[in-house]
């Protein structure tokens, strides 16, 4: 059975490293949000104009209906607006953030820095074992190995990084403990969306 104390340490390492990736991403996200705001505002304005026309027409008809029917229309309108917000988030914000993240993680030097940071983090926690580092499938292993250098490569099983099944980012596997420290692109995108989604909504959908 795995040592629960060590597993807690592993979780702390992953959390700390993921949070460190947020700072440059927040700066880029600000630019994405600014660029997206004009596009999102246009989409929302058009949708709200159409919604206003529909609501006006529906209101005239609703005057002849029971309050229960009017309430149902209001609820439907709220659900439609929420669906619109989610569509804008996915189209304007998430896709832009994913594209930026993919481009950033395609840099072999970035992958090398992430691998080195993960190795240093587990060493600082006193965790040892056979290590296998995986990088994104579109990143050149040779370039990453050159950035890592002989000292770090000597700590890896096979004396070099391996290609993972993910697009970008890295994973570090502690073989004898069957642990995987995950900083892959999908994991980082989910993390960034959770941290930045609220700020995006507040900026884009103010007053809506």
UniProtKB/Swiss-Prot annotation:
Signal peptide: none
Any one annotated GO CC term: proton-transporting two-sector ATPase complex, catalytic domain
Keywords: ATP synthesis, Hydrogen ion transport, Ion transport, Transport
The keyword Ion transport belongs to this UniProt entry's keyword annotation: yes
GO biological process terms held by the UniProt record: proton motive force-driven plasma membrane ATP synthesis
A molecular function (GO) term: proton-transporting ATPase activity, rotational mechanism
Pfam hit, one: HrpE
Function: Produces ATP from ADP in the presence of a proton gradient across the membrane.
Record-linked NCBIfam families: PRK01005.1
Membership in a protein family: Belongs to the V-ATPase E subunit family.
Name this protein carries in UniProt: V-type ATP synthase subunit E
Organism (species): Chlamydia abortus (strain DSM 27085 / S26/3) (Chlamydophila abortus)
Gene symbol of the encoding locus: atpE
